């Protein structure tokens, strides 16, 4: 009997969490297919505000990367929307005319932002704040415009406003209520929050109702019902969300505010479940992650036939993610005749605490300025703890006063530390004592604590410190390369050298990896470190590379690939152009585009056509997919330009031919400009060369991406040979001392320009670095030609393996 077909509609946090729970209890029961409307793998939507605020990058909020889907034999269709469920024939139909049968179906369509139905809401410059696309829109706007208006002073609106402030914009927050976050805070806490955020630079317009968004093609401002107005170049709508029930309603699945489900997350149609923000349970649709994960656990067990307690609803807690502000609320914090409040207000230090009691039970809490007791109070609310024999005011006094410096020391083992993932203090202690976890990353890998919003990370570290005592290593909390080991990057590298290790599995076995198979974070890193240390003897582990590097092409959101052949220095000829044109016609490649690195990108190549395309092109790989040298961009130079002082094309071609295929911690881009006019943009490259009278200037650590950084002047040299010598030593030193996935810009800021200069100015060290560089380059093979010669591997990779699409 074959596996049952399980289809998940929605690639977000709730739906994929349900899949994770299913895999944990019945890994081989289902053949899983996932449809996601966005072009990305599953990511942590909660942390988009951190991306906007500049605290993290998009890549860092990915929860399950492309490799996770492949490793679990999951067929992922990104950028594809299910538009109909045929409940009679048990199939789903997508906007790409794909028909997918199912035995079990999970609807996790999430929610959609509420856009005010006012004139001008469709103008350019008006956006919601729900996904990566919205975040990119705001990041792009901040580079061109200066005045932002955020409509909505709730949790999401304030996090968006803080991010826009960090991006250098003037931010006004428009809110209909008389104080901020009125659904989570009382008036006192709301006004304290307003005062704090005003100090950070925000402007607030309270009790304002937006009547119109004004402007021609693009937004220019807001007009309010009271006749006043403000200027704005960007408007962010953060006034709420509503469950996305369109698919359910149009498919005959009963809906109300959300898709109606029972206590096991089943809809009224057999074999169809709903989970997350789209689901309505006992009249409530939840929008926070903790209840959605609780739902996912119940759904998974029920679908797999495992006895489980029903889902009976959730008590909610909220924590604002804005730097420098501590805000927490939980439960029912509004006072009434039946509910009385106890409040503590330290006006001098800006600390406000309030609990709401119904009889002898805490039913709600609000904390401002000091949220350290939030988890403890939330646990008491959830458990409906009887406090009849407790001094009421003592509940608001920090337990740390009675139990040393550790808040968590006084907590019971069943108290929840990570509300998002339902991880208790006892579960964390068990992971430390029984599984040997000794860092927050390892705790995250073992238990899931701090995996979502990250707010509980200080408490997790505190439990580690209290449990391990003198064995606790604070430095290890930040330096372990992943949760599979306690070893730092430097320790791993030293162990590989000392023990002569040559394969990723050997490293994990010998160095005592806690997860035998490793993870998608450590395996590519180990593979890189092994090749960097001993390039002539190590065994490349293709399975430890990211999917683009395994396929030697970039996967696109529709499952096709892009192919970029090498064009040294951005220079081509008629023969190569004819080859490219013939390949485009022969394989019906839908898009041909010039890249920013002066190359030609063939986009939309079918997976099975990749080897044939490479063979017909008969050109070297451009490594557009790898952690390696990408391009060397050049201007036309002194041969043709009236201002050029040097032959930039010749040097660019020499650099690219020397260093092509060089594995590096992250991608490396170079450029050579023939004069200080810098037409090749040498000043924002990892290594940039600028021609001057009588020689060259070398710039390093530049970045033209999200975190724009001008390169630093490394030195001046006179000849092309010196450029190649110093470039080789610089790149080798970067290879040997950078963390895997650390760009040269971040590495240079970490180690310091003066330190790098002192290393490269030492002739002996420079010679040694170039010697190791030349050894590495001596084993380089063009991967496309290598695959064409290795028929067996090519067949396995391009014909038999299930990949994400």
From Swiss-Prot:
Record's cofactor remark: Binds 1 siroheme per subunit. Binds 1 [2Fe-2S] cluster per subunit.
Q: Which residues bind FAD?
A: 43-79
The entry marks the following residues as binding [4Fe-4S] cluster, namely 635, 641, 675, 679
Enzyme Commission no? 1.7.1.4
- GO-annotated molecular function: 2 iron, 2 sulfur cluster binding; 4 iron, 4 sulfur cluster binding; flavin adenine dinucleotide binding; heme binding; metal ion binding; NADP binding; nitrite reductase NADH activity
Does Iron-sulfur show up as a keyword for this record?
yes
Binding sites annotated in the UniProt record for siroheme? 679
Q: Which InterPro entries match?
A: BFD-like_2Fe2S-bd_dom, BFD-like_2Fe2S-bd_dom_sf, FAD/NAD-bd_sf, FAD/NAD-binding_dom, FAD/NAD-linked_Rdtase_dimer_sf, NasD-like, NiRdtase/SiRdtase_haem-b_fer, Nit/Sulf_reduc_fer-like_dom_sf
State the reactions this protein catalyses.
NH4(+) + 3 NADP(+) + 2 H2O = nitrite + 3 NADPH + 5 H(+); NH4(+) + 3 NAD(+) + 2 H2O = nitrite + 3 NADH + 5 H(+)
The residues that the entry says bind NADP(+) are: 193-223
Q: Which residues form the signal peptide?
A: none
Quaternary structure annotation from Swiss-Prot or TrEMBL: Homodimer.
- Record-given protein name: Nitrite reductase [NAD(P)H]
Which organism was this protein described from? Bacillus subtilis (strain 168)
């Amino acid at each position: 009997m074959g596996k049952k077909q399980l289809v998940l509609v929605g690639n977000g946090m709730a739906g994929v969490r349900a899949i994770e729970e299913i895999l944990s209890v019945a890994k081989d029961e289902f053949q899983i297919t996932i449809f996601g409307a966005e072009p990305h793998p599953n990511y942590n939507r909660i942390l988009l505000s951190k991306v906007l605020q500049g605290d993290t990058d998009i890549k860092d909020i990915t929860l399950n990367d492309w490799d996770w889907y492949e490793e679990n034999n999951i067929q992922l269709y990104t950028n594809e929307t299910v538009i109909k469920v045929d409940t009679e024939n048990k199939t789903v139909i997508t906007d790409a005319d794909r028909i997918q049968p199912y035995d079990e179906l999970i609807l996790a369509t999430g929610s959609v932002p509420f856009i005010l139905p006012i004139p001008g809401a469709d103008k350019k410059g008006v956006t919601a704040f729900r996904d990566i696309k919205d975040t990119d829109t705001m990041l792009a706007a901040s580079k061109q415009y200066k005045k932002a208006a955020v409509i909505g002073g709730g949790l999401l609106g304030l996090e968006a406003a803080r991010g826009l402030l960090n991006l250098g914009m003037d931010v006004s927050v428009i809110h209909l209520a008389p104080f901020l976050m009125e659904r989570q805070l009382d008036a006192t806490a709301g006004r304290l929050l307003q005062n704090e955020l005003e100090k950070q630079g925000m402007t607030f317009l309270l009790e304002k109702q937006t009547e119109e968004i004004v402007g021609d093609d693009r937004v220019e401002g807001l007009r309010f019902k009271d006749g006043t107005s403000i200027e704005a170049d960007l408007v962010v709508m953060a006034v709420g969300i509503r469950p996305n029930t369109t698919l359910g309603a149009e498919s005959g699945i009963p809906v109300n505010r959300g898709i109606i489900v029972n206590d096991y997350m089943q809809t009224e149609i057999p074999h169809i479940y709903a989970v997350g923000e789209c689901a309505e349970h006992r009249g409530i649709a939840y929008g926070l992650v903790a209840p959605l994960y609780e739902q996912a656990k119940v759904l998974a067990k029920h679908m797999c036939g495992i006895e489980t307690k029903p889902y009976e609803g959730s008590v909610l807690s909220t924590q604002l993610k804005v730097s420098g502000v501590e805000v927490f609320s939980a439960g029912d914090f509004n006072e009434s005749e039946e509910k009385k409040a106890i409040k503590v207000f330290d006006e001098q230090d800006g600390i406000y605490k309030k609990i709401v009691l119904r009889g002898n039970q805490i039913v709600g809490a609000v904390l401002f300025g000091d949220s350290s007791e939030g988890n403890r109070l939330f646990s008491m609310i959830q458990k409906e703890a009887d406090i009849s024999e407790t001094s009421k005011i003592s509940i608001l006094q920090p337990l740390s006063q009675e139990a040393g410096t550790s808040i968590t020391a006084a907590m019971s083992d069943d108290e929840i530390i990570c509300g998002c993932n339902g991880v208790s203090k006892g579960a964390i202690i068990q992971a430390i004592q029984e599984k040997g976890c000794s860092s927050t990353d390892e705790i995250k890998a073992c238990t899931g604590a701090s995996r979502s919003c990250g707010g509980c990370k200080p408490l997790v570290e505190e439990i580690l410190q209290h449990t391990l005592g003198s064995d606790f290593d604070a430095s290890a909390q930040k330096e372990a390369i992943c949760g599979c080991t306690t070893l730092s990057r430097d320790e791993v590298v030293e162990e590989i050298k000392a023990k002569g290790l040559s394969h990723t599995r050997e490293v994990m076995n010998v160095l005592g990896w806690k997860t035998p198979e490793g993870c998608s974070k450590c395996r590519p890193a180990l593979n890189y470190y092994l090749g960097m240390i001993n390039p002539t003897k190590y065994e490349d582990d293709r399975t430890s590379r990211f999917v683009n590097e395994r396929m030697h092409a970039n996967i696109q959101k529709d499952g096709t690939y892009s192919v970029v052949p090498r064009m040294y220095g951005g220079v081509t000829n008629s023969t190569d152009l004819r080859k490219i044109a013939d390949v485009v016609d022969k394989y019906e490649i839908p898009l041909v585009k010039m890249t920013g690195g002066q190359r030609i990108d063939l986009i939309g190549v079918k997976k099975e056509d990749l080897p044939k395309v490479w063979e017909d092109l008969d050109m070297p790989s451009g490594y557009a997919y790898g952690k390696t040298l990408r391009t060397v961009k050049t201007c036309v130079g002194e041969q043709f330009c009236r201002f050029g002082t040097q032959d930039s094309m010749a040097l660019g071609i020499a650099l690219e031919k020397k260093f092509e295929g060089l594995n590096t911690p992250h991608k490396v881009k170079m450029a050579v400009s023939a004069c200080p006019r810098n037409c090749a943009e040498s000043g924002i490259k990892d290594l940039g060369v600028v021609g001057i009278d009588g020689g060259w200037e070398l710039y390093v650590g530049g970045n033209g991406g999200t975190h724009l950084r001008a390169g630093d002047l490394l030195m001046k040299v006179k000849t092309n040979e010196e450029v190649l010598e110093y470039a080789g030593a610089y790149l080798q030193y970067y290879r040997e001392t950078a963390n895997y996935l650390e760009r040269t810009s971040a590495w240079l800021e970490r180690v310091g320009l003066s330190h790098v200069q002192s290393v490269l100015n030492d002739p002996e060290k420079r010679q040694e670095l170039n010697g190791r560089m030349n050894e590495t380059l001596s084993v380089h093979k063009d991967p496309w030609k290598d695959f064409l010669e290795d028929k067996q591997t090519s067949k396995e990779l391009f014909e038999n393996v299930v990949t994400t699409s």
